[in-house]
Amino acid sequence: MTEPIVVGRIGRPHGVRGDVTIEVRTDLPQRRFALGAVLGREGGGAPLTVAEARWHSGRLLLRFQGVEDRGAAEALRDVLLTIDSAEAGPPVDDDEDAEGEGGDIWWDRDLVGLEAVTTAGATLGRVTDVIHAPAGDLLAVGRPGGGEHLVPFVREIVPTVDPAAGRIVVDPPPGLLDLD
């Protein structure tokens, strides 16, 4: 297995037959969580095979083979589900610009670890996480002295992403870096 990619996190059980809620962390949930899909567990453990998948009130519910009651489902809470990076294919751009063109796209793992600098050349720190919030993606940038900046991951604020050079350039609006 090559490097695993986290595609979801198991949440709380739903009902009494072993269903669990899923915090989706992938571009194509319909493909990643299809019937029969085999998902790894970050940190090890037996793989989980999707026996049933459905959406309920805006949440993805899964049932895995061999997980047949609420107790077994509860034991899976907070497990991070992974796929093999070789199976992932290219990331999918579901955002288009005003001209209908897709933008540059990256896997989260391509961004974590990049140095973040301002357009003036000041070092902000390193990207430690990509947070997929309902209002949009945020880059968590760990500051050298501790703490972090949360930077909206939009072209206007992060005009340059260069994984080959190991850095991103941030053009912060006034006050963004003062908010902690």
Curated annotation (Swiss-Prot):
The keyword Cytoplasm applies. It is found in: Cytoplasm. Keywords: Chaperone, Cytoplasm, Ribosome biogenesis, rRNA processing. One of its GO terms (cellular component) is ribosome. HAMAP family: Ribosome_mat_RimM (MF_00014). It comes from the Bacteria. An accessory protein needed during the final step in the assembly of 30S ribosomal subunit, possibly for assembly of the head region. Essential for efficient processing of 16S rRNA. May be needed both before and after RbfA during the maturation of 16S rRNA. It has affinity for free ribosomal 30S subunits but not for 70S ribosomes. The lineage of its organism: Bacteria, Bacillati, Actinomycetota, Actinomycetes, Frankiales. Belongs to the RimM family. The keyword Lyase does not apply. This is Ribosome maturation factor RimM.
